Amino acid sequence: MSIFSARLASSVARNLPKAANQVACKAAYPAASLAARKLHVASTQRSAEISNILEERILGVAPKADLEETGRVLSIGDGIARVYGLNNIQADEMVEFSSGLKGMALNLEPDNVGVVVFGNDKLIKQGDIVKRTGAIVDVPVGDELLGRVVDALGNAIDGKGAINTKDRFRVGIKAPGIIPRVSVREPMQTGIKAVDSLVPIGRGQRELIIGDRQTGKTALAIDTIINQKRFNEAQDESKKLYCIYVAIGQKRSTVAQIVKRLTDSGAMGYSVIVSATASDAAPLQYLAPYSGCAMGEYFRDKGKHALIIYDDLSKQAVAYRQMSLLLRRPPGREAYPGDVFYLHSRLLERAAKMSPAMGGGSLTALPVIETQAGDVSAYIPTNVISITDGQIFLETELFYKGIRPAINVGLSVSRVGSAAQTKAMKQVAGSMKLELAQYREVAAFAQFGSDLDAATQQLLNRGVRLTELLKQGQYVPMAIEDQVAVIYCGVRGHLDKMDPAKITKFEKEFLQHIKTSEQALLDTIAKDGAISEASDAKLKDIVAKFMSTFQG
């Protein structure tokens, strides 16, 4: 009998009268013993059930340890946070502050980490916890971005809701090597006569647009985007060109105007705008070009074609200088850090024409640089000129003379684009660059002497008329076949006796005439990409007939 049973029996016996005590004890012991045994069996069964339930629960738990590496803010100011404790962090890794703000680790020092803050640093204070994300800075990429305006981190800022993309690309991807590339061979038509004829651009090229403020740099870039509408409306994917416009350090009102212009022109459907305006933090202005480039690389790596415009890289360099000086990196020429060349070279080298084995896609870059008083020998302009495959140089003097686009044909050059220029344009524009160069040379001396020989006078006449012919309004890009027809009139001498003031009117009426009555010829030039002998004779005949009826 167990101790429990004995105690139960004695308890029952104590409560009975003394006379019946002995009898009761004898009767109570067996009953108490039986009750105790039943209780013991029941408790043992319940214990077994509980053990089984606990065992099932323990086995069902996934062995997951939620470890986070955190640090604390030592100091914060001017968009730079010094953080202690993140010993295993990677360079360019994204971190998250307790306020929800994001940042990027740029300086990895023995006792602290220099973090640039993507936003308003007033939301961060000393002692705040900083958490590693384990991810290098990346942005959303994909077709879902087309038609949207995003910030440097790929977040929608156009009020049209969140963007749900399937893929994300790192912003700092290494540029393609030599083997995956091929030489530039397909034309990237801007729709601007002066560019497509004299400084042609190919798909996969880097062509710099450089000039002082208010000389039409952005207008040139926007016209190029608008001109792609004629290709993007067609079904042929190989002809389509997706456009990314990166606005760095510009006014918000300017970006809003660009969005409106592209929307009104029907160009927003194949474009993405990445905006890091002057009111955004310097780290966002530094990051925006890389983010836009990653979005363009998505199309390039899918075998498609993309165009990216960086407007402008001078402001990115200024933002990078600000960050570097605040991070206590040693300054160099013009107070820029020593790696400012690498800042732009690693960005622009990502523009490439890929080989057929790599999908045959391309990413064309049009970086913009703003000069001060026409000084192209400054640090940043010379850096970017040496990285790119040519430059379009815009001059204030030409702009105020009414020559718009204000392209200085002598200083502008395309180092690889001529290989991509259509044969038809080569046929008509081949002699034009030489004639314009000779005209500029002679024009300087012509103002000193009145008695010029006939050949020199002829050169001056032709140069004045060709310069007039290359003028073009904003937001009216031209198809390549229209450009060929107009330039043909100038280089073949049909306009030599015309009053230069009437050339703009002539161009408008001539194009109207040829489109209404001779559209088949334009279609043939566009399809063949060249002017055959038959087309040449027909075009000559059309021009002669029109000239006889043109009133001016």
From Swiss-Prot:
GO terms for molecular function: ADP binding; ATP binding; proton-transporting ATP synthase activity, rotational mechanism. ATP binds at G211, D212, R213, Q214, T215, G216, K217, T218. It is found in: Mitochondrion inner membrane. F-type ATPases have 2 components, CF(1) - the catalytic core - and CF(0) - the membrane proton channel. CF(1) has five subunits: alpha(3), beta(3), gamma(1), delta(1), epsilon(1). CF(0) has three main subunits: a, b and c. Mitochondrial membrane ATP synthase (F(1)F(0) ATP synthase or Complex V) produces ATP from ADP in the presence of a proton gradient across the membrane which is generated by electron transport complexes of the respiratory chain. F-type ATPases consist of two structural domains, F(1) - containing the extramembraneous catalytic core, and F(0) - containing the membrane proton channel, linked together by a central stalk and a peripheral stalk. During catalysis, ATP synthesis in the catalytic domain of F(1) is coupled via a rotary mechanism of the central stalk subunits to proton translocation. NCBIfam families: atpA (TIGR00962), PRK13343.1 (NF009884). This is ATP synthase subunit alpha, mitochondrial. It comes from Drosophila melanogaster. The gene is blw.
